Amino acid sequence: MSESGADGTPLDGLREQVREAARAAAAHDLAPKPPRASEVTLSQHMDLSRANIMGNVHGGEIMKMIDTAAGIAASRHAGGPVVTASLDQMSFLHPVHVGDVVLVRASVNDVGRTSIEVGVRVEAEEILSGRRTHTSSAYLVFVALDERGQPRPVPGLVPETDVERHRQAEAKIRREHRLASAEAIRRRRDQLEA
């Protein structure tokens, strides 16, 4: 019996589709792209099925939307399949209420050789008043995959505006911090094991 995904789709078929997309992506030009080429905006009405025991929208629902939007932006930039490598920062600033419309905006901030950092901003809109509140922000890192599921090179990024250049500079700082933190933890563990 073959495996099925959550929606009943045979996983073997999905895996072959991913491999085919990766093969096609490998043939893509690696010419740099601007952030606008991969920007994503998702919107979703928040109903009772998404509520936590406090009556607000469960944070996990927001996190799933963030990962989805960021993954689409990264995949657009890479021109093929990507996987979430890390959630670098996640901030919940204000609750989202049942009845709100959630707007999730994702754009590529910077790229490495095989990695893509995507910034995400979440806003909740009160339908009756139209008032929007910035509720969450996150930075995620994705890795582009080839047909064997191995990391593959991604196109460069060409910021076009001062805001995009600012985001890219901040992304480089976050990357430096991630690498320094990983190295400090590795050294600490080596000391404990010695």
Predicted ranges, named:
Residues 43, 76-77, 82, 91:
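N-terminal leader/targeting segments and the first structural element of proteins
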Residues 46-47, 92, 142:
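Hydrophobic residues in beta-strands and at strand termini
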Residues 47, 51-65:
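A conserved, well-ordered hydrophobic junction motif at loop->secondary-structure transitions
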Residues 61-79:
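Active-site helix/loop of acyl-thioester processing domains in fatty-acid/polyketide metabolism
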